Amino acid sequence: MEKNHSSGEWEKMKNEINELMIEGRDYAHQFGSASSQETREHLAKKILQSYHKSLTIMNYSGELDQVSQGGGSPKSDDSDQEPLVIKSSKKSMPRWSSKVRIAPGAGVDRTLDDGFSWRKYGQKDILGAKFPRGYYRCTYRKSQGCEATKQVQRSDENQMLLEISYRGIHSCSQAANVGTTMPIQNLEPNQTQEHGNLDMVKESVDNYNHQAHLHHNLHYPLSSTPNLENNNAYMLQMRDQNIEYFGSTSFSSDLGTSINYNFPASGSASHSASNSPSTVPLESPFESYDPNHPYGGFGGFYS
DNA sequence: ACGATTTGACCCGC
DNA sequence: GCGGGTCAAATCGT
């Protein structure tokens, strides 16, 4: 039995992530007792930064699996190699989840979307769960081969709580837009829509190291990094007015490791990045709470 | 007419 | 065999 890629490398990542998360937690603590607006802002940045970095690493590791192992399916085929299909096995995809709460007062008809357009492709009753789980994938899966997917499930007890788990990395052009539209409009020339994630991941990691020291007073530290962070759903959610970021995000890799974090976050970001750049407030997968429409979102398929 | 959603069937890993 | 995830035909909405 061997793991996907050098476990030493993974160990390193794991440690790094761990540190980052602890760091984030500390900031979150401070955030709670921070009095001045400035301090809070600063701390918020820090917190996001920690998460961002962690995710970047997670994503990076996910890609690593795919590339170096040409599929990353740990077992079942040891001598069987699919021709150059980087058909990322789901297992090796980066994955994280977060809880989102629908603000009671806010109109439920507002859109909560994480900036991407999703298409629902399935719904399933989950054992022990009161509500069904919705399965979504990126609208551009077919056209652009974007593999990102997510699952949305309403919490048993608290109907105002949604648990969303994301998988895979957005490689669609939308990824470039989301990441930049929302935080701040300072695109860099390198943000072409053509970049594949494999490159982006690495670049991102590198960039991050530079930019971590460079962000000035951008609204969000993440703004400067390309594509990748679009997967940072947690922050995308924070920006929404109707949904409060609930303060719990967990990342997990395939290697049986998972890290959970809870913190008292009060997302207060404002801007407006929705899937449709201009008009139609496309319903979000999360909030259709009609008896008829458990979730909005997308549904779709693939040959 | 076309794209999105619904929903039962199918597939696959445990 | 069971449960979770995906497919794809039918249906719905625009």
UniProtKB/Swiss-Prot annotation:
Primary location class: nucleus
Xref: Gene3D superfamilies: WRKY domain
Alphabetically ordered keywords of this record: DNA-binding, Nucleus, Transcription, Transcription regulation
Pfam families for the chain: WRKY
Domain of life: Eukaryota
Keyword Calcium tagged: no
One Gene Ontology MF term: DNA-binding transcription factor activity
Compartment annotation: Nucleus
InterPro entries, per the entry: WRKY_dom, WRKY_dom_sf, WRKY_plant
Region (Disordered): 65-92, 266-291
Biological-process GO terms, alphabetical: leaf senescence; response to hydrogen peroxide; response to ozone; response to salicylic acid
Ranges of the DNA-binding region feature: 107-175
Induction of the gene: By salicylic acid (SA).
Amino acid composition bias (Low complexity), ranges on this chain: 266-278
A single GO cellular-component term on record: nucleus
Family the entry assigns: Belongs to the WRKY group III family.
Subunit structure: Interacts with WRKY53, WRKY54 and WRKY70.
Functional description taken from the UniProt entry: Transcription factor. Interacts specifically with the W box (5'-(T)TGAC[CT]-3'), a frequently occurring elicitor-responsive cis-acting element.
Protein name stated in the entry: Probable WRKY transcription factor 30
Gene: WRKY30
